[in-house]
């Protein structure tokens, strides 16, 4: 049993006055369209691309129409960070939900860990899941179920990630999810592509690797 989510009074809640790059602005525009069309979308953007700022217009659009918005993330520290940032950038009350948070109170904007989505049913017009590749959300059927049922019947779902997952890739391949990709950071420069340069003969490097592997300890190569 659940209580139906009532609409909020629509207001212009966005206080942020920053400027997006052309690449960010294009994705921001597509997210606003997704809100209007009630679509599911994956934003696959590199770390440092400015994903948080790119979702602001979509959040603002949903709140302006009286909708309920939730940003969920697998990690409590990220939820706290998002709460601090969005409290400065939006004028509406915000609920922060995690294992140690105060009791929930009804607000047009909720920031939570993904486990807290289990508390909601048909509650949100816009659900944004940040760091969807991270534990414990990644490939967790129970949390995907929670995300699905926390949305209203006609809602917008946005996944944010710098590293896609097999589950999301399959949804994209099946045309159940639209992927938007941004491979540039906020400064607009393309990513640096590493080039292998060996300063010593490969046989020497191989011998050192073999010696390390025989030690029984993990090996991490950069």
How should these model regions be labeled?
Residues 80, 85-120:
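Inter-Walker segment of RecA-like/P-loop motor cores
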Residues 61-64, 102-104, 119-122, 149-154, ...:
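Conserved catalytic network of the ASCE P-loop NTPase/AAA+ motor domain
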Residues 16-39:
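N-terminal pre-P-loop "Q-motif" helix
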Residues 43-52, 62, 67-79, 209-222:
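Conserved strand-helix element at the start of the C-terminal RecA-like helicase core
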Residues 54, 58:
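Hydrophobic positions on the alpha1 helix immediately C-terminal to the Walker A/P-loop
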Residues 122-207:
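Post-DEXD/H (motif II) to motif III coupling segment of the RecA-like Helicase ATP-binding lobe
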Residues 1-19:
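Cys/His-rich short segments
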